[in-house]
Amino acid sequence: MKSIQMDNKSLFKEIEHLVLNVSFLTDIGLFHGKMGHVIFFAHYGRLVNNDFYEVFASELLDEIYEEINTCLPINMEYGLCGIGWGMEYLVGKGFMDGCTDEILKDIDNLIMERDPRRFHDLSFRKGLGGILYYVMIRLSSPRETDNLPFDSLYLQSLREVVLEKDFSKEKSLSFLIDDFILVLDGKKKIKPDLSVLFQISLPEKSSTDLLQDGLEYGWQILESGDVDKLYKEYPWGKDRNYYLINEESESANYGIGTYLNQMIEAMKESDYSLTIITLRSSKTSSLVIEEKLNVRYINIGSTRCKMNVMNWIKYFERYYRSVIVLLSTIAAENQNNIFHLNNMHMKDLALGLKENYPLSEIICTVHYMDWKLQLLGDRRKLDYILNHPNDRNFKSISIVLEENKKFLKLCDKVIAVSQHSFNTLVEVCGLPKSKIVFVRHGIKDEYKTMSQEEKGSIKRKYGFHSDDTILISAGRIEPLKGMDLLAEAFSSLVSEYPHLRLVIVGGGSPDVVQKKVISYCGRVSFVGFVNKTDLYELFSISDVGVLPSLYEELGYVALEMMMNGLPIVVGNHSGLEEIVDGGKYGLVVPFEQDYGKSKENAAILYTVLDHLLKDNSLRENLQKKSRERFISCFDISCFTRFFKERVIGINNEKTNTLS
């Protein structure tokens, strides 16, 4: 076998990449598929003394049992003989328990259905040569009785084929042909051996891609036996470790990204070493680690398989299992670990952490629940769905909700970011109140007092006049955020307020919104996604902040507006209403929870905005109250204090409500 050279760093990355992707291979065979990788990981785990890899190999083997079918060819390369040979090998090496006559009975019967006399391909990988080798291995397998796995008629037909066929063109099979008759007559036994396998069948091409053509290369790696070249652990910091696990998504540019920043602030000067792990990252296809300002950042790549090609529940189950294997090189089982899961789809990750890190604590934050987004938080609709579980129109909502419940029950603590979220966790998900901690979001106070001259300068910078009255909204442009309602309400306001301008900040598709303001396009600015500095500048020159969401768990944008002293108008039925305390610190629009009521909702929004624009004293009063509310409830110091007390146990306070 040709020697292939690779540096250590590349080797680690190849193995990590393999862990993430092997479960999604459609080939379950020996040379390029799952069976070959089962053998690799079984040996690898034993060599580097990491049980996670041996368990991983066993779970891959279970997948082979699930996916094997009668439509597979019977050859050695990617068919039944190769899979059967692999199982004989695993039992022989002590990686797998059981009687191979029982395990392989169905495979042996399928192989006997094919008449060997009709084979024209005599090669080892795809033809008769491989079948002969498999039969030799099976006949040599230890057994307590004289009962053979193949009947006498089939064995006689193989004897005739070996004596009659011309194998001279297959030079690598010469010793196999000689030995076959001896094994058939009970005069010799042979054991499955990988090195012999590759002597018989030279690889068609040399590859260092363990995923596609890596069985030969993987075996060469293992034969070296040099653990330092094969395995790397990533030890870290203190005895107490806090792992915040997130998934890459567009929301990282918005709320989730802000949450990570507030977590970094909250963990400063704590006894825990903070690691932020981003899953399904586009930055790598394996695992990448870097450190910044005493925080370790780990990116774990996605898979070659796209989630839409298989059931999403199965996809996450397999992906998160792979993540658990990679985490074994990062998090020690005997350390004081807290795993904080930042996504409601992480049920299988939580399950794996429970099983493999029994001394650790698992926490999750409920940023949102899918059913609330789809139903706009309407409990009446949810009650209908729960009472009609077989209604096909809502089947997906029922399935996701049940998965969410299973996930939450696996967690030791569940963080609710709003009171209505707390209530939902108790009433809908059935969680005991003692398991839930209520910690509102908080952000760092970056408010800057500005003179009228400074504000005028910023207005000119963005193309506004000094006497313009600016309404501003920020968030992704989609129906849920109510931007179309704002555009329609604005179209009704412009005739009454000649200096009124509308600024919409955020990504998404503005087409629907633009159509509603086509006659006033010169007075509407779509600025797209902007950085925080520019966003806060825009807030500083605006007169009213408008967040007309039909549903929102607890919006960071509202906190940023209040921090900057903006009077805000928000939708009801969500955490936004809680932020303004039901109308004490901002105006609440009584929307109907129905996309079909857009005209009615736009009219209600128009009425509220018209009232606020006409009443200067109300705006000035809400400016002061908005800022006061932020300082007393949503400054980062509030979040940090309650997080340390209620989540990581500093001061041992265990209250579940905030004042």
Regions found by a protein language model. Give the residues of each.
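N-terminal subdomain of nucleotide-sugar transferases
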Residues: 234-285, 334
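Membrane-proximal helix-turn-helix segments that form the acceptor-binding/catalytic region
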Residues: 370, 386-414
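Conserved donor-binding/catalytic core segment of Leloir-type glycosyltransferases
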Residues: 465-481, 487-490
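Nucleotide-activated donor-binding/catalytic signature segment of Leloir-type glycosyltransferases, i.e.
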Residues: 513-533
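Short hydrophobic beta-strand element within catalytic cores of glycosyltransferases
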Residues: 567-570, 580
